[in-house]
Structure formats: structure tokens, C-alpha cells
């Protein structure tokens, strides 16, 4: 079976991650003690591929294939005392006592480096338990110290050890207006530098965009992190539903990557989810494939603060869940591309992939998850990069990092590495089909002369 190993790090990662496990347990009929509680009728579907995310332990308990890490015990304690706290294998909670203090260098070089071997041992143990490991999914934020510093350290170590497995990350970027710490731009830039090199697919999330969705679409006046994490977990569950349930058009992490990544460094995706409705208005909304399609391509639905209308889609993927006709899904997708052709690059024809999974999320008739590779994601990088430069020019707060043994050179390097994807996205946003052809002709001429 194609297993996925889930790793969550830092406060943000652990909070998103534990919410995700609540959703997954719910979808597979697993109760907080790890026992299966579904009916006989559901059991075929729920249990057929439950081992993608769960290990079956003695006595028929299902244990998540999850590794939880943090540099301070606080978040772990609250997960343990939470509703699904007893479901995780106790050995898989690896934590330090010191904390990273929002300092990337502590997470990556000093505190995190001391704890990393313990985490890797657990990861190896879990990986050996797998039949045919498909890949890893990592939940972390890029603004803090542990999720960003230690998270990227773990990603690079896992990359070294399992070079041929997919590495999918759910990365929460610092948002433009909501800032928790002053040094977010530093931490994020140093992390992006790592993600460009070592991750295969990055789902970019952002608190501000999530707040906007809660506020505007869900009509929540005071959204809590719980509400935001609920949105994220719905999306996470949607991205992997094809692996966990039978469907007419299934995809896995690798198929997703092959269809979404035209060039290796351009692997930062925007995600969206539909239907998003406020709690009171569900009964007034009919769920049809056109409705879902319209909502999921809507710029307001994107979970990161970049506007897809400011760029063009290189590729996109739509995952539908529920009983629906594949033909209708395909027609809708073609329809979207024809109507909005200016928002798609013309040098990748048919660049929207769709997949259909027969089992909808709990409580919905149908739903869809959107993953898009849009050049407008460079807005995110640009914004962080500007904030980084403003502080780095004055060498503000730098002593916290150099004190942990970092070098100023690393900052300069990270800054230019952050600007690489920006330039690359811009280049392909401006490229037209004709540029490419001229280029090919020139290349062909060169070859004739060389031979």
C-alpha cells in the first residue's frame, strides 16, 4: 500500500497537524481511542486503504503514521490532553525543553540539531513499518523558529536518506498584515531557500488569506486559529483523498507533481477548497459541479495572500469528491480554460488536470480541492523579500542569528535564493508560445553549425 508519513513541527505545525488527524480519523471512522467505529456498510470504503495514514497495532487499534516534534513541551502537552491525544504513539512525540525562541538559527543549527537525530530515528522506524512508502508530508510554519529552522533541517536530512520519495510540505507563510514576530522575514527567507532545494511540492498557506476567508465567506466575526486550521485540514484531506478512497480518476503525490510542476524550482502551489459556506447558510446552497468549479477558481478562495489574477496559471489540478459524472467535471474544466484563457499560459496546452474521488468529506454531498501553480505566487516571495531587505540593510536583529554561529553570508545567499524563484516565475509569466519557438529555431541552427 502507498503509505504517507506525516511529520509536524513547531507550534503551528502541531496545531494544524492535530486538526488534520481529527479530520482523517473522522473520515475513516476511527474514534479517539484508535478503534474503528463505523458501520459494516461503510467499512469497505473506510478500511480499504486506511493504512495510507494508519498503522494497525495489536488489538485492532489504528495508530497514525505521524511524527510530532517541537523544541518545547507546551504544544505537545495540549495535544496529549486534547480529544485525539491518546491516538498517537507516545514514542513518536519528540520534544526538547528549551524552545527555539522564534530564532531560525536555534532551530536549524543549535537546539534543533541536538534533537534531530531522535526525530530521524522515529522517522526511520515509521518508514520501515511501511510496505511501500510513497512520501512524506510536513506541516510547519515559516515564521517561527522550530517549524522553519528545524523543519527545514529535517526536510534536508530526510531528503538525503530517502532521495526518491516525494516530499510534500504544507507551509504557513508570514502574512502581510498579521505578524506574530518581528523576525518573521528572516526566518521565512532562510526557510524558502531550503524549500526551493529540498521539497518536491509546497502548499503555500497564509494566515491573512485564511482570516479573510473566515471573515468574508464564512461570516465569522472573530475567527480563532481553530477555525483557520479547520480550513487547512479540509484542504489537506482533499489533497490526499485520492490515495485513501477509491475513485474514478485517482491521483497520488507523484502524479500530482508530474502534472503541476513544469520546471523543478517552480513547485509552490496555491490551494483552495469548495464549498465554503457560513454555518447557517448551508441549506440554501445547492452543490453542483458548476457551482463548485466557480467557487474553487475564485480568487477570494485561495488560502495564500497572492491574487491569481495578477499572474497566470502554469498548471492547475482540481480534485473533486462525491458522486458526480466525470464527463461533467471535464466539461467544466475545459469551460474554465476557454473562458479565462488569458489567465493560463498558452505554451502548456490543457494544463488543468482533474481527478474524481467517490467519497465526499463528512457532512457534504460533494466537495472539491484546488491546487494551482500560478506565477502570481511571486507576490508572496516579493513581499517577504522586501521586508527582509529593509531589516537586513540595517543589520537589525542579526546578532540573534550570528550568536548561534550563523554567518552574514548565509543571509545574503538566502536573499538571492529567494529572488531566484521570483525571477523565474516572472520570466514564465511573460513568456509566450512564440518566444519558445524562436528559441527552438536558434537552438536548432546552433546544432547544425556544431555538427
From Swiss-Prot:
Residue segments, region Disordered: 413-451
Residues annotated for Mg(2+) binding in this entry: 72
SMART domains per UniProt: Tubulin, Tubulin_C
Ribosomal protein among keywords: no
Source organism, top-level taxon: Eukaryota
GO cellular component, one term: microtubule
Comp. bias (Acidic residues): 432-444
Pfam families with a match to the protein in the record: Tubulin, Tubulin_C
UniProt keyword NADP, yes or no: no
Record note on quaternary structure: Dimer of alpha and beta chains. A typical microtubule is a hollow water-filled tube with an outer diameter of 25 nm and an inner diameter of 15 nM. Alpha-beta heterodimers associate head-to-tail to form protofilaments running lengthwise along the microtubule wall with the beta-tubulin subunit facing the microtubule plus end conferring a structural polarity. Microtubules usually have 13 protofilaments but different protofilament numbers can be found in some organisms and specialized cells.
Function: Tubulin is the major constituent of microtubules, a cylinder consisting of laterally associated linear protofilaments composed of alpha- and beta-tubulin heterodimers. Microtubules grow by the addition of GTP-tubulin dimers to the microtubule end, where a stabilizing cap forms. Below the cap, tubulin dimers are in GDP-bound state, owing to GTPase activity of alpha-tubulin.
Stored PANTHER family: TUBULIN
Name the UniProt record assigns to this protein: Tubulin beta-1 chain
Record lineage: Eukaryota, Viridiplantae, Streptophyta, Embryophyta, Tracheophyta
Gene: TUBB1
Amino acid at each position: 500500500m502507498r503509505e504517507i508519513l506525516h511529520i509536524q513541527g513547531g507550534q503551528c505545525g502541531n496545531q494544524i497537524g492535530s486538526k488534520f488527524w481529527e479530520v482523517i480519523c473522522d473520515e475513516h471512522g476511527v474514534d479517539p481511542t484508535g478503534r474503528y467505529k463505523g458501520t459494516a456498510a461503510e467499512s469497505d470504503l473506510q478500511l480499504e486503504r486506511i493504512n495510507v495514514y494508519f498503522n494497525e497495532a495489536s488489538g485492532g487499534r489504528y495508530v497514525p503514521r505521524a511524527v510530532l516534534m517541537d523544541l518545547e513541551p507546551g504544544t505537545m502537552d495540549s495535544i496529549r490532553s486534547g480529544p485525539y491525544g491518546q491516538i498517537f504513539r507516545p514514542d513518536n512525540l519528540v520534544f526538547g525543553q528549551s524552545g527555539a525562541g522564534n530564532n531560525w538559527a536555534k532551530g536549524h543549527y543549535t537546539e534543533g540539531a541536538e534533537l534531530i537525530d531522535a526525530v530521524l530515528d522515529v522517522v526511520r522506524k515509521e518508514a520501515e513499518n511501511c510496505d511501500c512508502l510513497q512520501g512524506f508530508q510536513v506541516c510547519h510554519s515559516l515564521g517561527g523558529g522550530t517549524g522553519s529552522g528545524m523543519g527545514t533541517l529535517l526536510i534536508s536530512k530526510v531528503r538525503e536518506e530517502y532521495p526518491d520519495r516525494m516530499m510534500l510540505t504544507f507551509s504557513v507563510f508570514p502574512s502581510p498584515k498579521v505578524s506574530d514576530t518581528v523576525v518573521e522575514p528572516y526566518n521565512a527567507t532562510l526557510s524558502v531557500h531550503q524549500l526551493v532545494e529540498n521539497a518536491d511540492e509546497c502548499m503555500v498557506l497564509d494566515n491573512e488569506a485564511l482570516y479573510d476567508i473566515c471573515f468574508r465567506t464564512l461570516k465569522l466575526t472573530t475567527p480563532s486559529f481553530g477555525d483557520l486550521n479547520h480550513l487547512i485540514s479540509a484542504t489537506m484531506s482533499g489533497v490526499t483523498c485520492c490515495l485513501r478512497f477509491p475513485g474514478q480518476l485517482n491521483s497520488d503525490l507523484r502524479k500530482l507533481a508530474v502534472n503541476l510542476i513544469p520546471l523543478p524550482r517552480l513547485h509552490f502551489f496555491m490551494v483552495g477548497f469548495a464549498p465554503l459556506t457560513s454555518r447557517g447558510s448551508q441549506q440554501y446552497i445547492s452543490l453542483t459541479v458548476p457551482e463548485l468549479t466557480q467557487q474553487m477558481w475564485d480568487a477570494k478562495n485561495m488560502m495564500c495572500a497572492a491574487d491569481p489574477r495578477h499572474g497566470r496559471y502554469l498548471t492547475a489540478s482540481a480534485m473533486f469528491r462525491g458522486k458526480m459524472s466525470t464527463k461533467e467535471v471535464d466539461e467544466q474544466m475545459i469551460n474554465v480554460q476557454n473562458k479565462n484563457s488569458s489567465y493560463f499560459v498558452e505554451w502548456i496546452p490543457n494544463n488543468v488536470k482533474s481527478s474524481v474521488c467517490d467519497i465526499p468529506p463528512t457532512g457534504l454531498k460533494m466537495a472539491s480541492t484546488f491546487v494551482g501553480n500560478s506565477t502570481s505566487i511571486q507576490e508572496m516571495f516579493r513581499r517577504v523579500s522586501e521586508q527582509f531587505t529593509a531589516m537586513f540593510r540595517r543589520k537589525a536583529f542579526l546578532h540573534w542569528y550570528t550568536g548561534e554561529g550563523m554567518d552574514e553570508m548565509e543571509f545574503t545567499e538566502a536573499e538571492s535564493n529567494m529572488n531566484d524563484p521570483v525571477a523565474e516565475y516572472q520570466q514564465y509569466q511573460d513568456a509566450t508560445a512564440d518566444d519558445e519557438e524562436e528559441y527552438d529555431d536558434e537552438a536548432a541552427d546552433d546544432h547544425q553549425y556544431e555538427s
